From Swiss-Prot:
Belongs to the glycosyl hydrolase 74 family. Keywords: Carbohydrate metabolism, Cellulose degradation, Glycosidase, Hydrolase, Polysaccharide degradation, Repeat, Signal. This is Xyloglucanase Xgh74A. SUPFAM superfamilies: Oligoxyloglucan reducing end-specific cellobiohydrolase (SSF110296), Type I dockerin domain (SSF63446). One of its GO terms (biological process) is xyloglucan metabolic process. Its EC number is 3.2.1.-. Pfam families: Dockerin_1. The gene is xghA. BNR repeats lie at residues 134-144, 185-196, 252-262, 358-368, 533-541, 577-586, 616-626, 660-671, 708-718. It comes from Acetivibrio thermocellus (strain ATCC 27405 / DSM 1237 / JCM 9322 / NBRC 103400 / NCIMB 10682 / NRRL B-4536 / VPI 7372) (Clostridium thermocellum).
Amino acid sequence: MVKKFTSKIKAAVFAAVVAATAIFGPAISSQAVTSVPYKWDNVVIGGGGGFMPGIVFNETEKDLIYARADIGGAYRWDPSTETWIPLLDHFQMDEYSYYGVESIATDPVDPNRVYIAAGMYTNDWLPNMGAILRSTDRGETWEKTILPFKMGGNMPGRSMGERLAIDPNDNRILYLGTRCGNGLWRSTDYGVTWSKVESFPNPGTYIYDPNFDYTKDIIGVVWVVFDKSSSTPGNPTKTIYVGVADKNESIYRSTDGGVTWKAVPGQPKGLLPHHGVLASNGMLYITYGDTCGPYDGNGKGQVWKFNTRTGEWIDITPIPYSSSDNRFCFAGLAVDRQNPDIIMVTSMNAWWPDEYIFRSTDGGATWKNIWEWGMYPERILHYEIDISAAPWLDWGTEKQLPEINPKLGWMIGDIEIDPFNSDRMMYVTGATIYGCDNLTDWDRGGKVKIEVKATGIEECAVLDLVSPPEGAPLVSAVGDLVGFVHDDLKVGPKKMHVPSYSSGTGIDYAELVPNFMALVAKADLYDVKKISFSYDGGRNWFQPPNEAPNSVGGGSVAVAADAKSVIWTPENASPAVTTDNGNSWKVCTNLGMGAVVASDRVNGKKFYAFYNGKFYISTDGGLTFTDTKAPQLPKSVNKIKAVPGKEGHVWLAAREGGLWRSTDGGYTFEKLSNVDTAHVVGFGKAAPGQDYMAIYITGKIDNVLGFFRSDDAGKTWVRINDDEHGYGAVDTAITGDPRVYGRVYIATNGRGIVYGEPASDEPVPTPPQVDKGLVGDLNGDNRINSTDLTLMKRYILKSIEDLPVEDDLWAADINGDGKINSTDYTYLKKYLLQAIPELPKK
């Protein structure tokens, strides 16, 4: 599938009522850097792995379903495989903001049309303005309209909605609810241009917390609902309802197609409307909460229905507002399109003993929860739950009654009933999408069979990766999910790293003892040590008795090549080293908070660090660091990586500062002039005929963003991704596979772990014809004589450390067993004595 923007360009018009509009094509690729074909896929974690704030069913075509992610783009359901297909993988690093999907709308008139309101943050964390993405082929290709304001796909209140809505009578018309006081916007040309609805009276007043940059903006206009019955096909819908994050007046109505607006009289006050659904019987159902979610949800909540035909408001809250058991927001809301009296609502973060999912078959007069209390601490469950598609959803822990594992979820900001199938239901959680296919069994006294419905969604924020030379091919550290051992790239792991931290932030292994690993993390519990060690390649972890001084956790970790020391650089403290697996720690001399540290992959005594614009080396296992006084360094460094098998070979990825390398342990560095930017750098198995590991980076070469590989120590590069596979933010970790040439693993911030392998039609590099000299010629004079025998003897006895030739192993390993020892000396001596006619052929 080709996911791209058309090359047509329109002038941006900033007028009083017309939004800036532009339709962009893909960036023009320079031909200076060669591209080679690669195939790309996700390393399967399974289950989603992140928060999916919304699910949208098309109301006129069966099985046309979309899901939106807060940092991972958007997906379309594939009914033939029952998996989700990612739709926005073409966005590169410079357009990462568009992986934050604020809202999604699927056209009920022309199901081929789908729209996305994209933009991740309203603050200054990312530079991009918001955008409306438009597709006429269900997300296969997209056009883009840039908006004159930002969207907040990963901001507070992101599960409220939907903010983007299509007029069901005249699908040229769309409405968009915005944040930050920007109000309500409208398009009359299929989303190409937009204008502010100046007559709309309330852009919202609610701010989650004005004291923090992330939470200080107005949540705004949060949903739009059309009353289809108020017009006829081909004519704009006259009656429109809009929900606003305002605790005084939150529900507004227009009866003249959006020309004028008034607050609906008699409406509830003091709460925020999370969702609004207008049923076919004229009832507008609304879920309310004290706060906007999705993390908090504590406080109070209500559920109301408004009879749009009589003007009557009816409180149908499952737990009375006055009750002490009413201690959470009501957020998710679903109405069965086959029966408007069947409704479902969810709690927003009740937490204990679990979430609440209520169902009513009489319009809210009575309710049933999906569980109820038995004899305390027992509970009676009206459901079964199957997590076989993502077994790690038990979080590796056991709960004490009345809690059980796995739970129903948390952050349940949206729930939907299939408009064509009353038995199918899906709902979102903070880690996956759950659902069932036998929902009506509940009404007959049966149990709902809940299962993971997120296959194909990979939305993890991955923070670090290692691919050791033995054991599992990949081990990860993952935000929110700690991390995993990935034994099979195509099958999700059965468990996450235990102990169960809140986020894994860094991982490393000992190059010469690869089963030894260290993991650093963040944790919600203060009594949990935020570093763990493993002696079996990450399958089991143990916590040390002590932590690095002054640490609150997180950060990065570097393990000595021989596993004898570990340096932890917490996010808030200076690096500290342990030589006894965390029993004791010592702050590393001459380094401070913010240092970037890595271990040499050959010499267990050596570590490297970049701190305050200087490069440092340690030769005593990380206890003390010394400034190498390397000249002309970049101002800052994102990652340091040392090359396995090459002592003293160090590479720096300095983002806009480029890519740097040293072959003398960091005393001198060379900036690679053929690399513009380098976010991360990693190494994998060398190409055939090469003795230097393949190098992988994400960055920019010849002004082209992408993923790149070098097989010749950085002399030349090839681009290994294409314009369909950008994956957004790819600046936390990259590593090649030391066992499979060409395979590379990349950590993304919202699209999980992606890996690439050469496509079948990529030519295998031809080994260069290099004259390494005669086998047995140890001094390079093109002769084999007694001088060479003497050199070999001295080398074996360690009276000399190096041979005069460039490749010691080639010249002196006579029998080709990978070692230089007495066997080779005997062969060479016999050859010189003419006891054998020739040396063994390698």
